[in-house]
A protein has these predicted regions:
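An N-terminal-biased, well-structured beta-alpha scaffold segment characteristic
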Residues: 4-117, 121
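Glycine-rich phosphate/diphosphate-binding loop of Rossmann-like nucleotide-binding domains
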Residues: 11-48, 167-261
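Generic hydrophobic/aromatic pocket-lining and core-packing "Φ" positions
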Residues: 28, 53, 115, 155, ...
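A structured beta-alpha segment of the ubiquitous adenosine-cofactor-binding alpha/beta core
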Residues: 60-74, 82, 234-266, 270-283, ...
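Short glycine/serine/threonine-rich phosphate/pyrophosphate-binding segments
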Residues: 85-86, 189-196, 207, 214-215, ...
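Rossmann-fold NAD(P)-binding glycine/threonine-rich loop
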Residues: 107-135, 275-328
């Protein structure tokens, strides 16, 4: 048996509502194949995601407590580091020691103070959100993988809240028309939302400010909505949409109003890294929608794409339900982990 050179520690997540775990039993086994690696898991770390302490022990990990991990691990893996856990992450930050590596989601663009705090403690932080969207880093691209899960789950939230069934059905009483679903933003989350809504039988349309998104929308069976706007420079690095000026957004909202008033479900997914989410759906636009319609705002944590969104709440305005879910991937913790 080789000499232990690196101890990797996985503490239980303490961020409220976080049910994911940073390392699954299957990946414990993969890491232990490397010489000199020891893995310590806090007892109960994987329970909320469906992984028992026994699963970790069988994979070769050692069960321990939180203090042992922060005292002795050279590398600490967390889903929500103190940078993204602003509720009670300070207690973990205070436990970190010089020379340690902290790997996880740190929200560095919105929380620069955390990066400074790590530097002062001589702790090296790896912000998984900043890993570029390239082939070599694909297995560590947490933004894309979590966005895929969020796009899937937001459609289920919409279907559950809607007064209508998604698919067309022929019944003895007559024909029930399929629901019309409109997805705003055709990134990873938006495309997955399109695909999921299509599988449920809805008529799906989608819009993205990036011209290149048209083919992607078609590839998942949705119909691209095209607006009379100049979008030549709408795409930034890494394939993400660039923030647009207020004049552009105002014109976009005027044109979009005519589209969404016909929809049964609207899903918004537009987010700008490190910045407040752009307002795509105004209160006036909501009032033009049919009673019983549903809006699911996946950008709720960054202020929301809808004027009326309240993070973590469901608001009813003029008979329209506006759902502002937060940390959606955590609601599917097994696969998200």
């Amino acid at each position: 048996m080789g000499v232990t050179q690196v101890i990797i520690g996985v503490p239980k997540e303490i961020c409220p509502g976080e049910e994911r775990v940073a390392l699954t039993p299957a990946n414990v086994g993969a890491l232990l194949k490397k010489n000199g690696v020891e893995i310590r898991i806090e007892r109960g770390a994987g329970e909320a995601a469906g992984f028992t302490d026994g699963d970790y022990e069988n994979a070769g990990a050692k069960l321990t407590d939180r203090d042992d991990i922060f005292s002795n691990a050279q590398a600490i893996l967390q889903v929500q580091t103190p940078g993204s856990n602003t509720t009670n992450g300070q207690e973990d930050l205070d436990k970190l020691k010089a020379g340690q590596f902290l790997i996880g989601m740190t929200d560095p663009l919105a929380n620069a103070q955390f990066a400074q705090a790590l530097a002062e403690r001589k702790v090296t932080g790896l912000a998984l959100e900043l890993i570029p969207r390239i082939t070599r880093a694909q297995s560590m691209d947490v933004l894309s993988s979590m966005a895929m899960i969020a796009g899937y789950k937001c459609v289920l939230l919409a279907a559950n809240a809607s007064h209508r069934m998604f698919p067309m059905n022929m019944t003895a009483a007559g024909t029930m028309n399929a629901s019309r679903v409109f997805v705003m933003g055709a990134g990873v989350a938006g495309l997955q939302a399109c695909a999921t809504a299509k599988r449920l039988g809805a008529i799906v349309e989608a819009y993205d400010v990036r011209p290149a998104a048209r083919e992607q929308i078609l590839s998942v069976g949705a119909k691209p909505v095209e607006l009379d706007l100049d979008t030549g420079e709408a795409e930034g690095s890494g394939g993400y949409a660039k923030a647009q000026g207020e004049d552009f957004l105002k014109r976009q909202r005027e044109l979009m109003k005519e589209v969404i008033k016909e929809m049964d479900v609207v899903i918004t997914t537009a987010a700008v890294p490190g910045a407040k989410s752009p307002i795509l759906v105004t209160e006036e636009m909501v009032k033009a929608m049919k009673p019983g319609s549903v809006i699911v705002d996946l950008a709720a944590e960054r202020g929301g794409n809808c004027d009326l969104t309240k993070a973590g709440e469901t608001v009813v305005e003029n008979g329209v339900l506006i759902i502002g879910p937060t940390n959606v991937p955590s609601s599917v913790p097994f696969h998200a982990s």
